[in-house]
Amino acid sequence: MMFPQSRHSGSSHLPQQLKFTTSDSCDRIKDEFQLLQAQYHSLKLECDKLASEKSEMQRHYVMYYEMSYGLNIEMHKQAEIVKRLNGICAQVLPYLSQEHQQQVLGAIERAKQVTAPELNSIIRQQLQAHQLSQLQALALPLTPLPVGLQPPSLPAVSAGTGLLSLSALGSQAHLSKEDKNGHDGDTHQEDDGEKSD
């Protein structure tokens, strides 16, 4: 009689233990699923961010490629112009007197020796002229741009020098206008003084 009772008691504890293990396993699976879901969400956000950065890089690449292609074409064009001008100089040179020939040859050699500071100065002047022409076309006042802000569609050689140059030009124009107004005021005062005499 004792054996069946012990057997019955053992069998009654087994479903409870099995039920507890199944519930625990389900909880673990649920926790792991939530963890994987969080990792998936994080990876998806990172993937979207990388895709956005990739499209931005591709856009910059296309822009720089077009700029590089345009500069390459312009360089070949300028090289061809220089070649033709050298040919014209070589044809005209024999018709000059010996003294003038030496002067022209010296001037040509000096023209070929362009230094980096001279190039930077030339590029800066061209950039200033281009910016001023754009500002005049847009009918905007000559005020310096905020630091770090570049005009659209302008290839900047140096952001700092371009902005400082534009700022300097704006202040010079403003000062010259004030000087002119002050001079006109002095002229009117002198005229009034003469009339009073």
UniProtKB/Swiss-Prot annotation:
Residues 174-197 are annotated as: Disordered. The keyword DNA repair does not apply. Residues 175-197 have a biased composition (Basic and acidic residues). The keyword tRNA-binding does not apply. Ubiquitinated by XIAP/BIRC4. One of its GO terms (biological process) is response to interleukin-1. Found predominantly in muscle, heart and Placenta. In fetal tissues, abundantly expressed in the heart, lung, kidney, brain and liver. Lacks the C-terminal WD repeats. This is TLE family member 5. It comes from Homo sapiens. The gene is TLE5.
